Amino acid sequence: MTVSDHPQTVSQPDPESESRPSKTRLKQEMHALQALGERLVELEPARIAELDLPEKLAEALLEARKITSHGARRRHLQFIGKLMRAVDPLPVQEKLDAWQHTGMRHTAWLHQLERWRDRLISDETAVTEFVQTYPHTDVRQLRTLLRNIEKEKLAGKPPHNFRALFQLLRQIIPEIPG
């Protein structure tokens, strides 16, 4: 008997199977919810309260912080993932991303302050550029701090004026609001 003797059977797609997601997709979604739950566990209790989560989920998140055993923590995170199914993850994810973005913006501002401080100390022409960029600067106070920093370095004293310069820059250079 040859292959051509048998009619080819083409399986008809099951209409029910097309409407429901695959097991793989469901597992991926569950892992994503569990990962989101892990991020929530790392938050401070005040931040968790800001999210308006169901009480049972909020309690589970706070309890997870206390669990030290690896296996118990893993099971508890799976439980949190299960509880997360009842919550719309999009607003929670957006809030977490906004908090993270705010922290990154603040860090960038602090780095900008540090770069200005280092330039002002190492380059005498940076003072003129700084005053042009930030015209409301008290130039006399700035130059006094820079002179005192040099004196502290030569005397081997603690960097009091170094810190004072940073505080002055914090007052002068505005942090970009989010």
Curated annotation (Swiss-Prot):
Biased composition annotated in UniProt, kind: Polar residues: 1-14
Keywords of this entry: Cytoplasm, Ribosome biogenesis, RNA-binding, rRNA-binding
Location of region: Disordered: 1-25
Biological process annotations from GO: assembly of large subunit precursor of preribosome
CDD domains: YjgA-like
GO MF assignments: ribosome binding; rRNA binding
Main localization (coarse): cytoplasm
Pfam families: DarP
One GO location term (cellular component): cytosol
Subcellular location: Cytoplasm
The keyword Transferase is annotated on this UniProt entry: no
Keyword RNA-binding assigned: yes
Domain of life: Bacteria
Function: Member of a network of 50S ribosomal subunit biogenesis factors which assembles along the 30S-50S interface, preventing incorrect 23S rRNA structures from forming. Promotes peptidyl transferase center (PTC) maturation.
Family, similarity comment: Belongs to the DarP family.
Protein name: Dual-action ribosomal maturation protein DarP
The species this protein was found in: Nitrosomonas europaea (strain ATCC 19718 / CIP 103999 / KCTC 2705 / NBRC 14298)
Lineage of the organism: Bacteria, Pseudomonadati, Pseudomonadota, Betaproteobacteria, Nitrosomonadales
